[in-house]
UniProtKB/Swiss-Prot annotation:
Zn(2+) binds at C72, C88, C95. This is Phosphoribosyl-AMP cyclohydrolase. It is found in: Cytoplasm. It comes from Bacillus cereus (strain ATCC 10987 / NRS 248). The lineage of its organism: Bacteria, Bacillati, Bacillota, Bacilli, Bacillales. Mg(2+) binds at D71, D73, D75. Binds 1 Mg(2+) ion per subunit. Binds 1 zinc ion per subunit. GO terms for cellular component: cytoplasm. InterPro entries: PRA-CH, PRib_AMP_CycHydrolase_dom, PRib_AMP_CycHydrolase_sf.
Length: 101
């Protein structure tokens, strides 16, 4: 089974394998998805820069892909990783560090 990229970018929720903590949300196009499978590292599509980016390529905070899950509609992805360093560009462990309720 493969993701359905016919409507464009798909959301990719990245979680830590050991803790199941949500680390970040990013978007994948088909090329990012294929590179993620090929390299076992996360690749995403930047909507602002309109280009691919490899998580941790600059910072060293890489994500080693352990598994990928596809939802029932084939239009969103869960990426299970072993995170090296913080996932957020702010230096926080997760991008979801602002508690609302």
């Amino acid at each position: 089974m493969k993701p359905n990229f016919s409507k464009g970018l798909l959301p990719a929720v990245v979680i830590e394998e050991d803790t199941k903590e949500v680390l970040m949300l990013a978007y994948m196009n088909e090329e990012a998805y294929e590179k993620t499978i090929e390299t076992k590292r996360t690749w995403f599509y930047s909507r602002s820069r309109r280009s691919l980016w490899n998580k941790g390529e600059t910072s060293g905070n890489v994500q080693h892909v352990q598994s990928l899950y596809l939802d029932c509609d084939q239009d969103s992805i869960v990426v299970v990783v072993k995170q090296v360093g913080p996932a957020c560009h702010t230096g926080e462990k997760t991008c979801f560090h602002y508690k609302i309720i």
